[in-house]
Amino acid sequence: MKIVVPIMPTSLEEAQALELSRFEGADIIEWRADFLDKHSILTVAPAIFEKFAGFEIVFTIRTTREGGKIELTDGEYVTLIKDVAAIYSPDYIDFEYFTRKEVFDQMLGFSNLVLSYHNFEETPENLMELLSEMTNLTPRVVKVAVMPKNEQDVLDLMNFTRGFKAFNPEQEFVTMSMGKLGRLSRLAGDLVGSSWTFASLDNTSAPGQVALADMCRIREVLDAD
């Protein structure tokens, strides 16, 4: 299970001030570019990709449609992704599949997509159908983050993940149940077949994230013989 740490600079100065030593133990850096305005993303990008050249990087623009900070038209969303991809070739590119279906055909040439679905309100009853639709597109990663209302929601997500991984062993899945109630799902990735877990430094990018130092210790305990 790889540990992903999101970074959320709101300016070039904040990006330049990020201290690499604080990311010890992280495997992947997720750059949440939506904390910038759309005109600043390409200005800040060189600082991000140069500083974190030793890590795998997920480029994410989490828009307001799925709980993010920036509002973009479909055209602006795709153009920004393509511009950053052409210049910096991030290891992974997040794509908000269900809210951007109309322009998904423009992304078919990308082999490094993280097809994602985020629901900060609930765990939808049709979660299996959502997972199935994304899995059938065979992206690099299928990512689902949902909010539980009760313990059964958490267990359902974990069981669905395990089932889909069993039937699609070559497909990478990243799933999590958010908030305090869903925290167990962030720790049991190896058990259910979720490849990544997200950990935080100072600020969380989603409810229920565990601090990086704590997650490193938890992984060490879980990986011990």
From Swiss-Prot:
Q: What is this protein called?
A: 3-dehydroquinate dehydratase
Which residues make up the binding site for 3-dehydroquinate? E30, W31, R32, R62, R186, S205, Q209
PANTHER family linked to this entry: 3-DEHYDROQUINATE DEHYDRATASE
The entry's family comment says: Belongs to the type-I 3-dehydroquinase family.
| NCBIfam families in the record | aroD
- Organism of origin is Streptococcus thermophilus (strain ATCC BAA-250 / LMG 18311)
Question: Is the Transferase keyword given for this protein?
Answer: no
Known catalytic reactions: 3-dehydroquinate = 3-dehydroshikimate + H2O
**Where does the signal peptide begin and end?**
none
